[in-house]
UniProtKB/Swiss-Prot annotation:
GO terms for molecular function: ribosomal large subunit binding. One of its GO terms (cellular component) is cytosol. This is Ribosome-recycling factor. It comes from the Bacteria. It is found in: Cytoplasm. InterPro entries: Ribosome_recyc_fac, Ribosome_recyc_fac_dom, RRF_sf. Its main location: cytoplasm.
Amino acid sequence: MTIADIKKTTEAKMDQSIAAFKNNLAKIRTGRANPQLLDTIHVEYYGSMVPLSQVANVALLDARTISVQPWEKNMGAKIEKAIRESDLGLNPASMGDLIRVPMPPMSEERRKEMTKLARSEGEGAKVAIRNLRRDANEGVKKLVKDKLASEDDQKRAEADVQKTTDKHIAEIDALVAAKEQEIMAI
């Protein structure tokens, strides 16, 4: 493995960490309705538990309401029950073959909890990025130790990896700040 390979794989892994972090952030509830909020809900479908998105169409009805359209009419009650029993604190209402999921307004205390959760997710993502930086630097040091790269190459590679790390951490900070803004907006 060369220094270029190490830098390339490190950047790719950091990008994957950012993508996973964005996915986790999307699941944190804000005052607005977000169809991704229901991604974690599983419904019993012919004896097995399947994600809600595999048995129904989940869409945004308006800023504070999510609509869930079951593909099979007999699934309505099961979907409604699964949403109600989730830890999201939602109260779905069935309207024929459409299930409306209104988003209750969040209290100030709940908003602060969600902000803390977003920050802790951000810290977790930063730790993952820093661990990738450490792994890359150790890989470069091993190349120098094995006489496959010079110490000058090591310094340049470590500086490049640090720049990549700084870029990704700045992106995480921006995402957390945007999420906090979204949570605190009434």
